[in-house]
Amino acid sequence: MNMKKLFLLNLPYLLFVYPFDKLAQAFRLAPGADLSGKLLSIGDGFTAARSSPWLSFHPTDLLIGIAGAVVLRMAVYLKGKNAKKYRHGIEYGSARWGTAADIAPYMDKDFFQNIPMTQTERITMASRPKQPKYARNKNILVIGGSGSGKTRFFCKPSLLQAHSSYVCTDPKGTLLPEIGTFLERKKYRIKCLNLINFRKSMRYNPLAYIRSEKDILKLVNALIMNTKGEGEKSSEDFWVKAERLYYSALIGYIWYEATEEEKNFITLLDLINASEAREDDETYQSPVDLLFSQLEEREPDHFAVKQYRKFKMAAGKTLKSILISCGARLAPFDIKELRDLMEYDELELDTLGDSKTALFVILSDTDSTFNFVAALMYSQLFNLLCDKADDFYGGRLPVHVRLILDEFANIGQIPNFDKLIATIRSREISASIILQSQSQLKTIYKDAADTIVGNCDSTLFLGGKEKSTLKEISELLGKETIDLYNQSENRGSQVSHGLSYQKLGKELMTQDELAVMDGGKCIFMLRGVRPFLSDKYDLTRHPNYRYTADADPKNVFDMERYMKKQRAVVKPTDTFDVYEINATT
């Protein structure tokens, strides 16, 4: 404790020096030779002491005045130290519902610079508010059972704000037609990866985003992680590690040696199909073996050569098994439409933070066969945006990128997502994880699920009945203190009545109350703020609602028409073959 604070704390007690000083002066001036005589004539002493309003500076009077003030200060200190600690009205808990005053510091005055959470609560997009204590990350956990309105009450209002770039999972393929016209009106670049109808999708080539050898390893890791069979063990065995070496070698060869037109998954599949190993002839060389032999002669320390050399350490029978495993893993790519989808790239993932862009990822909510493509894309997207922010923009993207991950459990596993969600905030990237129940997250990310939830400062519960989710929400809401009134009656030879009052702790909302919560209500929790029980956001009251297909069917967005129009526009980076024709007359 500093001296200034100590002085201010004891200053009031200096005022008591005066009465104790005057008391000592009155006793000293009272007539009488002994104690009894002075006490009998103490009135005369007070009269003499009051004759002068000033403090008596007689050493005895001054000493007694100071001593009296010190004794009083010590008495107050000892009483406070030994006092019982009461928390009146909050003995069993202080939980309560939040008010407008609680959320006010976290909202921006400009409505469109917020993320709508409920009808009355929203959070600002400003990552660095004037008062740092009000800073919260924009990672949001949205939980709602089937039919609770996750798309209508959260996704659509977020997109209609149009303050960021958006990457939005669209499980049913309905969000883009309903919101696309509005985004086009706002001059957004619109991208679409459609894994239900490939013909309505823009092209996506994962190899187009490889910038270094570490990107090759990241791509291979994401590919293997999201193409596991349902019965496959989570820990890698020998075969998976061998596959990893082979994929790394082939992709490394393509990236370094192939032409720009050949840097795609089609070339990778062609190389795998051209690979062969014979059990009875260890010296046999397939066309792929010959390619790597030629490369090794030129560059013995080539990245691809090192990976391939390790792969070829296996015997012929083992190599054949590995190649079969590779073919089985990439079997979905035998579909021509999927191969065409990944022939070249139109998504331009690394530019999402440069200007306002909306990327819709349309997934099937009934079949997860091609969901690994989305997981590959998201894995690359996080790394690309973080690298772009660090290398070109001093650590922060000029346009905030919001990932609205509807049906997050259907996307697949994004490698190191628990680490990414903890670091993307500073790069102006945020993720909204939308689930039907919290157990879905634990199924995919196991122990890392708690880390992911812990890095979401906001939680929006739209309703549900899954038991573990209800238990967790109820515990987070906390307990309030309530008054209990008991009335008793005893009947015997005489009738007696009794009354008793006591306090108890009760959950702000119990699990059964959460399970039967009004369908129009939701619970919003923000770190460091009391929870809010509010109405779900009314989409029809949004200022931009009139531009959606919900308001007017004429606003339905046609992605095929949009893609044709975009492909007809010549870009500065497009290359052409120029032929000179000499016309003779």
What are these regions (language model features)?
Residues F111-M117, F372-Q380, I473:
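Conserved long hydrophobic alpha-helices within structured protein cores
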Residues P19-D21, Q25, R136-I429, I444, ...:
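P-loop NTPase motor domains
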Residues M1-S148, R152-C155, K479, N490-R491, ...:
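Basic- and hydrophobic-enriched, low-structure N-terminal and domain-boundary segments
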Residues I421-I523:
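Conserved ATP-driven motor cores of ASCE-family P-loop NTPases powering translocation/secretion/packaging/pilus
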Residues I123-M125, P129, K228-F238, E260, ...:
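Low-complexity, polar-biased intrinsically disordered regions enriched in Pro/Ser/Thr/Gly
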